[in-house]
Amino acid sequence: MGHFYFVRHGQTVWNVENKICGATDSPLTEHGRKQAAETGKNIVESGIKADEILYSPLSRAADTAKIISEMSGIPCREEPRLIEQNFGKWESTPRDGKEFKKAKESFACRYEGGESMLQLAQRIYNLLDELKQESGHKTYI
């Protein structure tokens, strides 16, 4: 079986503004681009060898992956199932809002207009299972 390294995208505009951005596209800040470059540098310096970088269709993930790819020489491709959880009506609202915190307590419940944590987990587990079956001993970031 291969290996998976998980990397989070760099800082986004909505991270700075303390907004929930889940499946909504929020671009990287300049600091986020620097974080992506630092991650790419760390991957190279650590000697991590990967066959492919997979990223979500959101620009913050795509830009992070492409910066890492440029620095490491590892090819990258978009994988739609890696899109972040859809928080539905909570997208663009404050992360620390009382109503959102209350809604998060219902782990298995779907956010109105979005998806539940369980739905997200199922989507990701299906992808990981598929990659393990298709790729044998490949390593992914």
Question: Where in the sequence are the language-model features?
Answer:
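Active-site-proximal alpha-helix that buttresses catalytic centers in soluble enzyme cores
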Residues: 2, 7, 11-74, 78, ...
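Active-site-adjacent alpha-helix immediately C-terminal to a catalytic or transition-state-stabilizing loop
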Residues: 4, 62-63, 70-73, 126-141
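A broad detector of the eukaryotic-type serine/threonine protein kinase catalytic domain
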Residues: 25, 108, 129-132
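Generic structural signal for well-ordered alpha-helical scaffold segments
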Residues: 37-44, 121, 125-133
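Short, well-ordered beta-to-alpha junction loops that form the rim of enzyme active sites
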Residues: 56-58, 81, 138-140
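Phosphate-handling substructures
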Residues: 70-126
